[in-house]
C-alpha cells in the first residue's frame, strides 16, 4: 500500500475516532463522569485516538525527531495541536492512574477534559483547513 493510501485510511479513521472521543467527552462532562462503562469507553477511545495520532504523525515525519520537525513547521496551529495533544495525553494518563488506584476522580481529570476540549477545537480547525483532502477521497 502506498503512503498516500495509508494516510487516507489514517485520516478517515482519525475523523471517526475524533468524533467518537468528542461525543464521549461531552457525555462524561454532562453526567459528571458517572458510571464505570462510560469512563472505560472513553479510555478505550482515547487509546485508539492516540494510536491514530501517532500513526498520522509517523506517516508524515517517519521516525525523525518529531519535536524538531514540529518546531520547523510553518503553521503554528499544527504545532499547537501537537503540544495540546501531548498535554491532554499526559493528563489523561495521570488521571487514569489516579482513578484506577484511588477509585475517585481527581482535578487532573477536569484539567484533562478542558485541555482536551481545547485540543479538539484546534483539531477541528486543523481538519477544516484540509477539507479538500476529505472531499477528494470519498472513494
Model-predicted segments: where are they?
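Membrane-embedded alpha-helical bundles that constitute the cytochrome b-like, heme-associated redox core
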Residues: 1-139
